[in-house]
Amino acid sequence: ASPEISISEMRSVCELATLECYYHNTAKLDSEKKVLFWNTSKKLWIEYSGIAKLGVDVSKLDMKVDGTTVTIVMPDAEILECKVDETSLSEESFYSETTGLGSGKVGAKEQTEAFAEAQAQMQTEVENDETLFIQAKDRAKLLLENYVKNIGDAIGVAYEVRWDTP
């Protein structure tokens, strides 16, 4: 059986076409209230690392072969995963400061809120970095084009790859 260009093979190639970005940042949480006559505040900083993975949704990938022309319909890259690496968190990851009588210690509730803030902050940073999406899509294109050309080389056909959007 000679190799042929297959959409299912392209989808598996494309699953590898993700871009991983590592983040290291700090999120801050402020909590202020009045206890009797005193203003109190709690401040919590969380230092965290996280990983964002970008790539192409392979279910939206399509292809048409017309002679030696292969037209690949590929959507824009998107965030496949974006999360704070929980293993990067330790006692030393949390810095707190309390002022005022009755402010109390920073507890699990504040730590959970700070973690959620870190997660949201990282998601926003990734969403606003257009360069990452361009790099992820370009990487997917390169992998798919190499796949098509390798199949062509194996069967003695020089394929021309064209790109389209859904």
Where are these predicted regions, by residue range?
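Domain-level marker for long, solvent-exposed, non-transmembrane regions
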Residues: A1-P166
